[in-house]
Amino acid sequence: MLNRLRRTKIVATLGPSTDINNNLEKIIRSGVNVLRFNFSHGSKDEHKSRANQAREIMTRLNFHIALLGDLQGPKIRISKFIKNNIFLNVGDFFILDANLDQNNGNQERVGIDYKQLPYDLKVGDVLLLDDGRIQLKVIKSTGHEILTKVVIGGILSNNKGINKLGGGLSADALTEKDKKDIILATEINVDYLAISFPRCSNDLKQARKLAKEFGSNAKIIAKIERAEAVLNQNTIEDIILASDAIMIARGDLGVEIGDSELAGIQKKLIRTARQLNRIVITATQMMESMITNPLPTRAEVMDVANAVLDGSDAVMLSAETASGEYPAETVIKMAKICKGAEKVPSINVSRHRIHAKFDDIEEAIAMSAMYVANHLKGITAIITMTESGKTALMTSRITSGLPIFALSKNKETLNLASLYRGVTPIYFNSKNNNFKAANEAIVLLRKRGFLCRGELVIITQGDIMGKIGKTNTSRILKVV
């Protein structure tokens, strides 16, 4: 192996900053693996234009990068103030009024966009506005009005979000806007579709069904950001199993469960997702200071590194690339942090499912290949010749410290695999089967500079190339 490859993937959000100065191509060249379209912001035409530009760059550079559409979901917000903002003092009484015109907020009251909110609350509940910067205690909730008392005050401006401490708001996971955005996601052919604020597995099943009805085959990502979603281990597992991947959206989740609980929940979610053979993205404020600064803080470096050490498939950038001043520099710095953390030996050994029995042949082959990778001296790489990408995904659930090359002629499969930890997707289209195809794969990777003569590699493949679900062979070959 000539160069150590970065195993943890980087998700970057597109926005005004990537629209200028050739920044989209710069972040792609800097190492982005997934491009995120945040449907909370931007117009339909802007998203389509960015998708077209991204595909042109990917084709020209011969890069395999996944597109991720992120639905806004039922984010509950206050309306607008006549003077754009107010200052709330501790002890003030303040009314949230479901019937107030959306532009008529004042020092005493403001409108809300979720008319059901007064019926979801009881006396004593605590509402968290603007990511918890403002806290209101419910004194009375009747009809269309919620009378509150300010517990933590400060400046409150237009359209700030509302959360309930401990969760429990009944808004549906998919709004009418989300349904329109699923159509948009289908039109730009995203590989992944992120569902915001799911409370249970049924929310994800409904989203998957709706996406398929609109013609999308996108894999479903569950954004974990409600307290109900992490209520207990059974709920966590149900949500993970109903999705193809999860995103730990630490902003709203931290507001609802409390920041002090966040670190433990993050580790539990990552561990559980990997055990259940699902992908996991860690997100929110990872390199926040680089929105306006050319270097991250030491705390941000440690945050990214810890997400890598926890086993995240990917770490995500939001405003850092969408509206920040240093989008490419942020990606470069994050990539360096990931590679630095990946040097730690303790994360390169895994006993995951070492004693498990399998009903699925592909999974058994993947597990056996990774067992050999961790126990036979001299192995330098794992090569999975795959149609659907399933074998590549399964092998990536076992930590070995070795690169996994997913070889396929299916470009959609290669795009999906760009999110899998430790997996490098490579286009490969052989007319041969078995041993000849395996040797062709080795020659290709050696010519690309990934392998050296004399190294040992593990190859998984099926007897017949081009058939989904037919992986039944694992072999060890020497690079010549």
Swiss-Prot record:
Cofactor: Mg(2+); K(+)
Keyword set includes Transport: no
Pathway field: Carbohydrate degradation; glycolysis; pyruvate from D-glyceraldehyde 3-phosphate: step 5/5
Assigned EC number: 2.7.1.40
GO molecular function, one term: magnesium ion binding
Residues reported to bind Mg(2+): 225, 252
Keyword GTP-binding: no
Pfam families attached to this UniProt entry: PK (PF00224), PK_C (PF02887)
Domain of life per record: Bacteria
Catalytic activity: pyruvate + ATP = phosphoenolpyruvate + ADP + H(+)
Residues annotated to bind substrate: 36, 251-252, 284
Protein family according to the UniProt entry: Belongs to the pyruvate kinase family.
Quaternary assembly: Homotetramer.
Protein name per UniProt: Pyruvate kinase
Taxonomic source organism: Buchnera aphidicola subsp. Acyrthosiphon pisum (strain APS) (Acyrthosiphon pisum symbiotic bacterium)
